[in-house]
Amino acid sequence: MRRTKAEAEQTRNDILKAALILFDEQGYAQTTLSTIARKAKVTRGAIYWHFENKEEILAALAQAQFTELNSQINAAIAAPDTWQNLADNFIAYFRGLLKNPDRLRFCCIFNQHGRIPALEKLYRDYTALWQAQSREAVQRGKENGELHRDADPEYLYFYLMMIFTGLVELCLDQPDAPHLAQYCERVIRDTIALMQTL
């Protein structure tokens, strides 16, 4: 019997969900397509219908996690008050991170990029994208008066990523810590305010 588009999409989502759990619980290298198929309750053939290999599954997971964030960053850059919008988007991201187990799982996996070759390329690609977005945001901030005209885009990117990475680590290590969401918001707003003085 021919499957509907909705059924095919559900199968794809089931595969991604199973892979996300297994990559987190037993590691990317230790996870096979067979174990993903068993976890998702599908055949290996169903996996190959949607994905050629584990690398494609990993890339699809990254796309699912970062597409919305990247779209929001691009919208913030285009807005008149670029850096205020970026602060709002980063705060929303961390609120979602603390409330969404799947997002937390993926961040745990993504943070292993130094030990997983397939992740290393993804990490480099997304880092290059975020660095380009940061440069554009700095340029916009200079043009609209939010940042100093002589602000160094490379330093501001480094500074922002240092804060962002630290907050992600705290969310992964202590997701249930009291006041974490509130403190994340405060740190982000203070960071953006400080960057506007640099």
What is the meaning of each model-derived region?
Residues 98-118, 169-173:
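Amphipathic alpha-helical segments used for helix-helix packing
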Residues 58-65:
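Alpha-helical DNA-contacting segments of helix-turn-helix folds
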Residues 25-29, 100, 144:
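Short coil/turn segments at alpha/beta junctions that flank glycine-rich nucleotide-binding fingerprints
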Residues 60, 74-101, 153-160, 181:
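Hydrophobic alpha-helical connector segments
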Residues 90-93, 107-110, 160, 164, ...:
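Short alpha-helical scaffolding segments that buttress acidic/His motifs in well-ordered protein cores
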Residues 41-51:
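Short hydrophobic/aromatic patch on the recognition helix
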Residues 67-70, 74, 99, 117-144, ...:
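Amphipathic alpha-helical packing segments from all-alpha helical-bundle domains
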Residues 1-26, 30-42, 56:
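Basic, helix-initiating cap at the start of DNA-binding domains
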